[in-house]
Each structure stands twice: as structure tokens, then as C-alpha cells.
Amino acid sequence: LPRLRHFYGREKELDNMANLIEARATTLLVPGIAGIGKTTVASKLIERFMHRRNLLYHRCQDWEGSRSFFESVADWLANIGDSTFADYLAATPVPQPADAARLLVDALEGTPSLIVIDDFHKVADATLHQTFQAMSLALLGSEEEIALVLFSRSFKPVVPTKDAEGRIASLVLPLDGLDSDAGRKLLSSFDELADEQWLHIHGLSRGHPLVLELINRGASAGAFHETLENYVTVEIFSKLSAEQKRVLSALAIYR
């Protein structure tokens, strides 16, 4: 799990996720823009179920395919006493999504579990997408204590929200900015922060944790606009195509 320097707020979001997970077998999709705190929330969610469920945290990488993920799952299942999935991988050069999902859910029968997948937007492997789609449907109506939680920058419905009969297969819980009280605690570098100034900053940042941290870093020199511009340039603008940059330039002129 990633190390957290600090953590403020998010109690409402965490309570909501925990209640849904405890209520029944479920799949949750938690989308949010870059820097909004998805990995932090994922870490805290796992902490809530520590010593209560078998836990798997997997952070996706750009280069990753389904095979490497399946091998991680096989090792995890073997550690909790079930080698069925590992045997399947050893005998199957090209695992099938439906089979992999069924074996995974079957292996967790009678085993309270929480599977947290972080940075799912990085996954381009169709087999892995189809496996999670099949797993979300397999969990539908299950009486087992199994939960699958996907954290992603993408707001696209990567898992089905309903099955063919209209039953809810997954829930989408978008992650927004911090509330006013939690966000203000991130501005530790400000010696004095008037309410009016804080309201302006919170309105500007919309409670975005990373934006608030960048503002905090520039507080002593009064240069937080520069840190924000650097972040936008490196993390967003530099990754756009030429056509996307032209569209943004046009919008900036004619807004």
C-alpha cells in the first residue's frame, strides 16, 4: 500500500463504501480526476477491513496485461489456501475471461474478501476488462462476503451497472473534492488565513487535494500560481495531442 503523509476528511465517502461492502457481495466503481485522492481513499478503505477480510490491493501499470494480474491473484489465493486458480493458469496458456472470473469467485467461497484495483484506467487489456465485467455479474445475488472495488480516472462504465434482467450489478461512486473543513487543514504553510481568503481558495480549487497541496507549497513565497501552472503543464497539457491543444487554445480565446 502507498504511504500516506496525511489524511483529512473523506469519512462520508468511506462510510458509504464500507456500508455497501458489508451489506452484500458487490462491485463498486470509484472514478475521479487526477490527484483527487483515489489512492489515498483506497488505502484507507483497506485499513477499515484489515483483519476482517482477506485483502488484495493491486495497482495497475501502463504495460500490464491480464497474465501478470492473474499471476498476482493466483499467488494471493494460494496464500489463503486455494491453488485452483494457479493450476488453471499453469494449464491454460490463454486464460478466458469468463472462466477466470468464475474460478476466482468460486475460490473465494466462504472466504470474506476485498479486492481493490487502483489506477484501472491504465489497463488496455481486453481480457482483463472482460474478466472484471464477468466477475461483477458473478457476484450479483451471491451470498458470499466478496467485494470488488475499482478506482479509475475514467468515468466510462468499465463494468456493467445492470444485468440482462435489470438487477443492479455495480454502483458508481464518483470521488469529488474535499469539504471546506478537511481542505483547510492541507494549508499548513499559511501562518494566517482569513475566512475570505480561504473561501476564495476553496472555490478556486473546489477542494481538490493536490491543487491545495500545490497552493500550500507556494504559500511562503506567494507563488502558488506558478506551482499550479507547472502541474497543469506537466501532467495535463504536455500529454495532449496537437489537435486537443488547438481546441483548448480556441476555447481560451472565445470563452
What is the meaning of each model-derived region?
Residues 1-19, 84-88, 184:
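Conserved adenine-nucleotide phosphate-binding loops and their immediately adjacent elements
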Residues 4, 11, 201, 221-255:
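Winged-helix-like regulatory helical subdomains adjacent to P-loop NTPase cores
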Residues 10-13, 40-42, 72, 130-218, ...:
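Alpha-helical sensor/transducer elements of the RecA-like P-loop NTPase core
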Residues 18-27:
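Phosphate-binding P-loop
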Residues 67-87, 103-105:
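Conserved NTP-binding/hydrolysis module of P-loop NTPases
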